[in-house]
């Protein structure tokens, strides 16, 4: 009996260590970045971290995605992996519902209602997820077997294009400044100038460019205005003076005498406004280097003739993929160093309120993972998950358990809405996530690996 009980204790200790050790490795990298960028030491200036984030965005991450996803993907895998992008959509929908409950319970300031929903709904399904998977797979006791890292990175990369589309369409418009708040500020021109100076200040938080370098170059005429609210607010108005910023005839339809202008005038009022909003949606930003790398990997990997030329030990272009693989290996340490630099700035002052901050963090880091367990396990029992790989289910579960996406801070800055609140909330979420992720990774190991073993038996 004593031997049996000691064996159980040892097994539990191994399970706990298997979940703690990967995060400890990531914490070490983050602490190094924090010490290097801390204002008291300033061993590495903030500008260096901005350059490092640009390298991650434009080079390291695309190289990692292309080499790992391209080598793993096949036409059969695309069919088997269909639940990965669907799971991203499910996590966003369920997160939005939970975020709405947070609004009802915590009652944030009215101008932050949409912000609360967005920060609860959209998690970091990109860089942080890749870092967690890589750290787990570089542990000797990892339960996922050989080729763990390649499979995990492929699953995460296959989901990124869905998350990017959601951010640059749905999230972009949900994060526009509230109409009522904007009109109050608009009455006092001095206040507008102060807000614009703050948004364009060179001392903006590092998180603004942590996952979207060069964001200041992406600003458009209407990006910091309540564009959609004003467009559709003018539907019930017979006068165009209530919406002076958007030239529905001249700007989008050309000269008044042109055929296109005549066609636009014949459009229904609602359809014309939908078209204007669609033209103001930054769809072109979807084709960023990581997304392009994902598309190229899927295309090349799905065509056997192309894949045999690019991937494999005997491939004629294997020297190129080997070089890209070397550069891609720098992604995880670079991302964690940038995260440490972001955390070194500390939390900004926030008017969101302590109750709402705690509510969003609890909902995102504790409640949503529990709901995710129910969704993924139910999908597995219903036969919707065709892959028997435990890493597949592990990635699906992780998509529900990460902090809010750092990219949301960049969108907040681009829209001029809740920039300080996003910075403060992301700071505290990443601090609390150290505990929540440790707890849930241990649970996910048991659910994925033990369930798979029992199913084989």
UniProtKB/Swiss-Prot annotation:
One of its GO terms (cellular component) is endoplasmic reticulum membrane. Signal peptide: none annotated. The chain crosses the membrane at residues 16-36, 55-75, 86-106, 117-137, 152-172, 292-312, 323-343, 357-377, 394-414, 425-445. GO terms for biological process: auxin-activated signaling pathway; endoplasmic reticulum to cytosol auxin transport; intracellular auxin homeostasis; lateral root formation; regulation of growth rate; response to auxin. Induction: Up-regulated by auxin application. Residues 1-15, 76-85, 138-151, 313-322, 378-393, 446-457 are lumenal. Keywords: Auxin signaling pathway, Endoplasmic reticulum, Membrane, Transmembrane, Transmembrane helix, Transport. InterPro entries: Mem_transp_PIN-like, PILS2/6. Expressed in seedlings, rosette and cauline leaves, flowers and siliques. Residues 37-54, 107-116, 173-291, 344-356, 415-424 are cytoplasmic. One of its GO terms (molecular function) is auxin efflux transmembrane transporter activity. It holds the Pfam family Mem_trans. It is a multi-pass membrane protein. Disruption phenotype: Increased root growth and lateral root initiation. It is found in: Endoplasmic reticulum membrane. Belongs to the auxin efflux carrier (TC 2.A.69.2) family. PANTHER family: PROTEIN PIN-LIKES 2. Involved in cellular auxin homeostasis by regulating auxin metabolism. Regulates intracellular auxin accumulation at the endoplasmic reticulum and thus auxin availability for nuclear auxin signaling. This is Protein PIN-LIKES 2.
């Amino acid at each position: 009996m004593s031997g049996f009980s000691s064996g159980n204790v040892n097994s539990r200790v191994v399970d706990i260590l298997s979940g703690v050790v990967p995060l400890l490795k990531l914490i070490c990298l983050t602490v190094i970045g924090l010490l290097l960028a801390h204002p008291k030491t300033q061993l590495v200036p903030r500008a260096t971290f901005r350059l490092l984030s640009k390298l991650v965005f434009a080079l390291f991450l695309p190289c990692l995605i292309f080499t790992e996803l391209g080598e793993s993907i096949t036409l059969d895998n695309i069919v088997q992996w269909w639940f990965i992008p669907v799971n991203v959509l499910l996590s966003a929908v369920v997160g939005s519902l939970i975020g709405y409950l947070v609004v009802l319970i915590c009652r944030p300031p009215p101008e932050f209602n949409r912000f609360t929903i967005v920060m609860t709904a959209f998690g970091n399904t990109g860089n942080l997820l890749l870092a967690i998977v890589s750290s787990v797979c570089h542990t000797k006791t990892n339960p996922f077997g050989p080729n763990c890292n390649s499979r995990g990175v492929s699953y995460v990369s296959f989901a990124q294009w869905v998350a990017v589309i959601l951010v640059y369409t749905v999230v972009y418009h949900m994060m526009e400044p509230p109409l009522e708040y904007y009109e109050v500020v608009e009455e006092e021109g001095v206040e507008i100038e102060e807000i614009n100076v703050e948004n364009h200040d060179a001392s903006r938080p590092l998180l603004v460019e942590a996952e979207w370098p060069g964001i200041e170059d992406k600003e458009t005429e209407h990006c910091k205005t309540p564009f959609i609210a004003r467009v559709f607010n003018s539907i019930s108005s017979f006068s165009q003076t209530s919406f002076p910023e958007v030239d529905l005839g001249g700007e989008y339809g050309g000269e008044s005498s042109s055929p296109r202008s005549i066609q636009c005038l014949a459009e229904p009022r609602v359809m014309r406004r939908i078209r204007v909003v669609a033209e103001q949606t930054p769809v072109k930003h979807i084709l960023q280097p990581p997304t392009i790398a994902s598309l190229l990997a899927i295309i090349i990997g799905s065509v056997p003739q192309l894949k045999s030329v690019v991937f494999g030990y005997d491939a004629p272009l294997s020297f190129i993929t080997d070089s890209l693989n070397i550069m891609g290996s720098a992604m995880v340490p670079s991302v964690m160093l940038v995260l440490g630099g972001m955390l070194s700035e500390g939390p900004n002052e926030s008017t969101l309120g302590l109750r709402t901050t705690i509510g969003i963090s609890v909902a995102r880091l504790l409640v949503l993972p529990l709901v995710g367990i129910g969704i993924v396990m139910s999908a597995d029992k219903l036969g919707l998950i065709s892959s028997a790989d435990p890493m597949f289910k592990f990635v699906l579960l992780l998509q529900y358990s990460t902090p809010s996406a750092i990219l949301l801070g960049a969108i907040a800055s681009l829209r001029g809405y809740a920039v300080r609140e996003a910075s403060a909330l992301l700071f505290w979420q990443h601090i609390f996530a150290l505990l929540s992720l440790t707890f849930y990774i241990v649970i996910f190991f048991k659910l994925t690996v033990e369930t798979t073993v029992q199913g084989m038996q």
